[in-house]
Every structure is written in structure tokens, then in C-alpha cells.
């Protein structure tokens, strides 16, 4: 599976296309803004799906335009944010499910913390994992309550750390990175004592 990316929006957000090289079939992930750039990202492919890693506004700003242009199913986690936004999902993404894209597959990981409906998309048989705002090279995704921060810590321990060091993480903002490059920092972060009421921005 090939991963294409482009930055979109006034607060740069990474949109992605997952492309099956055997069939040319593609899926657009996180249509945050700038439909013309998103169409360029899909050039030469046959889009078959729109996928959301989560439903924060910076990741779905061009969703309605792209739905109107592409006429393909919308996949997302059926969490509270999707319900609050009244998104009409065509299919739900659940932990450990798989989704076919041409002859390729992605495995779904529920990775809550930054928000309840956050998922990550791992290419089966490959190294790429689209992590949304689960984590970045410099720290975990921002959290909005102490409970969310504790959820983020649990996600790092139970979901992210079991991934191999070779996992190539593609985040919602900023550069991609190998998990092995940041694993020692994550482990140190998890080993530290954090105030019970802490939440917000954090660095490893």
C-alpha cells in the first residue's frame, strides 16, 4: 500500500491517500481542507472510500465537499463526536477490524485520548500506520480533560508500544517518524509521575 500525503488548511494538517499499487484503488483519509489539493492527492487513482481518523474540525473541514465530489462511502468510529456532528456514516470503524482497499488491507486500532473516537490505520503486511492525533514525534496528542489524559496514557501503553519499532507513524500534523525513534521517550514519559489533574499539551 502506498501512502501519499499533503498539508492542507490554515493550521497545517496532513491529509493522506492510501493507494493500492496493484489496482489503483485509493482511500482519502482526513479531508481537512482545500478540496483542490485533495483531488490532486488522488490523481490517477480510483477513490473508493473516505476515512476519518477522528472528527475534529481541522480533520473534516472539506468532508462535505469531498463527499459530493467523490460519491464514496464514509468510514469513521461511531463515537460521540460523530454523533454530535450528525455525520451520516456509511460504515463504522471498530478496534481490530480490517478494511479492504483494492488488494490491500488496513487494520483499525482504537486509540482514544485526544478524543474518544480516535482511530489509527495500520497497513496490513506493511510498516505504515496513520495515527491521526494519537501521538507525534514530540509528544502525545493534546487532551481536553484529566480523564482524557489518563486514557491517552493507557492507549500508549496497551496499543502503541506493542507496535514494532519499524512502524512508520504518519500523524495528523508534522513529520512522520519511526516508532523505534521515540519508543525510549514514550517509555520514560509513561514512567514519570503526572499530576492527577493534568491535561492539555505535553511533551515526551
Can you describe what each PLM-predicted range is?
Residues 20, 79, 96-99, 104, ...:
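Conserved catalytic scaffold of divalent metal-dependent phosphoesterases
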Residues 29, 75-76, 131, 171:
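Hydrophobic residues in well-ordered beta-strands that form the structural core
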Amino acid at each position: 500500500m502506498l501512502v501519499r500525503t499533503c498539508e492542507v488548511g490554515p493550521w497545517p494538517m496532513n491529509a493522506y491517500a492510501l493507494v493500492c499499487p496493484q489496482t489503483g484503488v485509493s482511500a482519502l483519509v482526513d479531508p481537512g481542507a482545500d478540496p483542490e489539493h485533495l483531488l490532486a492527492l488522488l490523481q490517477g487513482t480510483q477513490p473508493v472510500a473516505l476515512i476519518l481518523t477522528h472528527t475534529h474540525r481541522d480533520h473534516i473541514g472539506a468532508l462535505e465537499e469531498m463527499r459530493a465530489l467523490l460519491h464514496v462511502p464514509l468510514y469513521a468510529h461511531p463515537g460521540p463526536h460523530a454523533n454530535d456532528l450528525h455525520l451520516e456514516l456509511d460504515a463504522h470503524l471498530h478496534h481490530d477490524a480490517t478494511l479492504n482497499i483494492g488488494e490491500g488491507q488496513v487494520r483499525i486500532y482504537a486509540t482514544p485520548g485526544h478524543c474518544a473516537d480516535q482511530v489509527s490505520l495500520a497497513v496490513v503486511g506493511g510498516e505504515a500506520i496513520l495515527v491521526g492525533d494519537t501521538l507525534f514525534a514530540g509528544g502525545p496528542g493534546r487532551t481536553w480533560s484529566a480523564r482524557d489524559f489518563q486514557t491517552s496514557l493507557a492507549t500508549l501503553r496497551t496499543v502503541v508500544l506493542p507496535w514494532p519499532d519499524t512502524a512508520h507513524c504518519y500523524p495528523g500534523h508534522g513529520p512522520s517518524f519511526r516508532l523505534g525513534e521515540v519508543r525510549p521517550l514514550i517509555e520514560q514519559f509513561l514512567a514519570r509521575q503526572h499530576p492527577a489533574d493534568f491535561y492539555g499539551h505535553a511533551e515526551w
